[in-house]
UniProtKB/Swiss-Prot annotation:
<feature type="binding site">
    <location>
        <position position="329"/>
    </location>
    <ligand>
        <name>UDP-N-acetyl-alpha-D-glucosamine</name>
    </ligand>
</feature>
<feature type="binding site">
    <location>
        <position position="308"/>
    </location>
    <ligand>
        <name>Mg(2+)</name>
    </ligand>
</feature>
<feature type="binding site">
    <location>
        <begin position="24"/>
        <end position="25"/>
    </location>
    <ligand>
        <name>UDP-N-acetyl-alpha-D-glucosamine</name>
    </ligand>
</feature>
<feature type="binding site">
    <location>
        <position position="32"/>
    </location>
    <ligand>
        <name>UDP-N-acetyl-alpha-D-glucosamine</name>
    </ligand>
</feature>
<dbReference type="InterPro" id="IPR050194">
    <property type="entry name" value="Glycosyltransferase_grp1"/>
</dbReference>
<dbReference type="Pfam" id="PF13579">
    <property type="entry name" value="Glyco_trans_4_4"/>
</dbReference>
<feature type="binding site">
    <location>
        <position position="139"/>
    </location>
    <ligand>
        <name>1D-myo-inositol 3-phosphate</name>
    </ligand>
</feature>
<keyword id="KW-0460">Magnesium</keyword>
<feature type="binding site">
    <location>
        <begin position="29"/>
        <end position="34"/>
    </location>
    <ligand>
        <name>1D-myo-inositol 3-phosphate</name>
    </ligand>
</feature>
<keyword id="KW-0808">Transferase</keyword>
<feature type="binding site">
    <location>
        <position position="87"/>
    </location>
    <ligand>
        <name>1D-myo-inositol 3-phosphate</name>
    </ligand>
</feature>
<dbReference type="GO" id="GO:0102710">
    <property type="term" value="F:D-inositol-3-phosphate glycosyltransferase activity"/>
</dbReference>
<dbReference type="InterPro" id="IPR001296">
    <property type="entry name" value="Glyco_trans_1"/>
</dbReference>
<dbReference type="GO" id="GO:0008375">
    <property type="term" value="F:acetylglucosaminyltransferase activity"/>
</dbReference>
<feature type="binding site">
    <location>
        <position position="159"/>
    </location>
    <ligand>
        <name>1D-myo-inositol 3-phosphate</name>
    </ligand>
</feature>
<dbReference type="Pfam" id="PF00534">
    <property type="entry name" value="Glycos_transf_1"/>
</dbReference>
<feature type="binding site">
    <location>
        <position position="233"/>
    </location>
    <ligand>
        <name>UDP-N-acetyl-alpha-D-glucosamine</name>
    </ligand>
</feature>
């Protein structure tokens, strides 16, 4: 596992403790991180770089190795009980995970850890093997705590300490956006020369425009409806309640809209909402809009692309977001986005061109923005064109090229070299 100094990487050890890359994104802890790990690995393999993805064996009788595609394997590491566990319990199995990873055969050039839990493992493995550690955080506890102070879903002190240790140990840090890079430096004291910004991508072959009426027919949606779509994990941080309350205000202000409006939520409960998976449906009933709301489980990407095409608007009202992959996927399908003006969404959405960014988290403000778009079909048409143009700049090939440059920098320069 000794790095080939002065050359591009030939083999990468990728670590994903939090969630398996084989899991269906959109529920539990599976989300954009899963998509990122899988899509970058596939494209690394296309360039001739082999990728081994190490993840926890979270179910009984899993095969030790699963081939994801030619050049990419997923290695299941026994660590803790062979079942899904609350992520709050995962720090207790990191020692077992680290030991299992160190026993695995392989000569790797670089370790790339995703999420702070993986980083705790990655720091030990990289140091033991004499190879550089590249770290992607995907979320930051201090940022989350600023918007969810003291609430369920906020980051505990042990997580903040763990994040700080990982950030200090990493040879290179990959930020999804300039905003995340600034947060790493300002909040965690990361050395600026070790922070590299690499925007995630989307599969532009899969997420592309299609016939809206056909998509709606496949999904059982009225062809003439005004469809608002929330896609992703259903948790407070993602703000599904904001969209639900905004929709209720729209309907109560215009009863005629009840015949046209469909509010769809595609995703599974995550975080604090896993204890009450029906909470979203209950909220719709309490607000008197149960007939207009449709709640669907997470679905494979081809079906998700149909949901994006079927939607009039995709709404991403996150209270915090390091990037917002859903927003770019939707725009790649030609659907404008109404999103919170937070974090990476300010990069994922081009305000006034591909969608609308909303300041604050007041449902009334979202209702106002959506109502204005309902009343202005010409603007919606312009935003559709802008969405396609903006999303075209987020293919995976550029992201992978930039990641490979980060790896080369880490291999050749070592710690502290830009």
């Amino acid at each position: 596992m000794t790095a080939r100094r002065g050359s591009a990487p030939h083999r990468i050890a990728t670590i994903s403790v939090l969630t398996s890359p084989l899991a269906q994104p959109g529920g539990g802890d599976a989300g954009g991180l899963n998509v990122y790990v899988v899509e970058t690995a596939r494209r690394f393999a296309e360039t001739g770089v082999q990728v081994d993805i190490f993840t926890r064996a979270a179910a009984p009788r899993l095969p030790p190795i699963v081939e994801l595609c030619d050049g990419v394997v997923v290695r299941h590491v026994p660590a803790g009980p062979p079942r899904e566990v609350d992520k709050g319990a995962l720090p207790r199995v990191l020692g077992e995970f680290t030991a299992g990873m160190l026993r695995a055969p392989g000569d790797y050039d670089v370790v790339h850890a995703h999420h702070w839990l993986s980083g705790r493992v990655g720091a030990l493995v990289a140091r033991s093997r004499g190879v550089p550690l590249v770290q992607s955080m995907h979320s930051l506890g201090l940022v989350k705590n600023a918007v969810l102070p003291g609430e369920d879903g906020s980051a505990p002190p042990a997580q903040i300490a763990g994040e700080s240790a990982v950030i200090a140990a990493a040879d290179r840090l990959v930020a999804n956006t300039a905003q995340e890079a600034d947060q790493l430096i300002a909040l965690y004291g990361a050395a600026p020369e070790r922070v590299h910004t690499v925007h995630p991508g989307v599969d532009l072959e899969l997420f592309r425009p299609g016939d809206r009426d056909q998509a709606r027919a496949r999904l059982g949606l009225p062809h003439d409806a005004f469809v608002l779509l929330f896609a992703g994990r259903v948790q407070r941080l993602k703000g599904p309640d904001i969209l639900m309350r905004a929709a209720a205000q729209l309907l109560h202000a215009d009863l005629d809209l009840a015949q046209r409006l469909v509010v769809a939520f595609v995703g599974g409960p995550s975080g604090e909402l896993q204890a009450d998976p029906d909470q979203l449906t209950k909220l719709a009933t309490d607000l008197g809009i149960g007939e207009q709301v449709r709640v669907e489980p997470p679905c494979p990407h081809p079906e998700l692309a149909d949901w994006y095409r079927a939607a009039t608007l995709v709404v991403v009202p996150s209270r915090a977001e390091t990037f917002g992959l859903v927003a770019v996927e939707a725009q790649a399908c030609g659907t404008p986005v109404v999103a919170a003006a937070v974090g990476g969404l300010q990069t994922a959405v081009r305000a006034g061109v591909s969608g609308v960014l909303v300041e604050g988290h007041d449902p009334a403000r979202y209702a106002e923005v959506i109502r204005a778009l309902i009343d202005d079909p010409a603007r919606l048409t312009a935003l559709r064109a802008g969405a396609l143009q903006h999303a075209a700049g987020f293919g995976w090939s550029e992201a992978v090229d930039r990641l490979l440059a980060v790896y080369r920098s880490a291999i050749e320069g070592g710690r502290g070299r830009p």
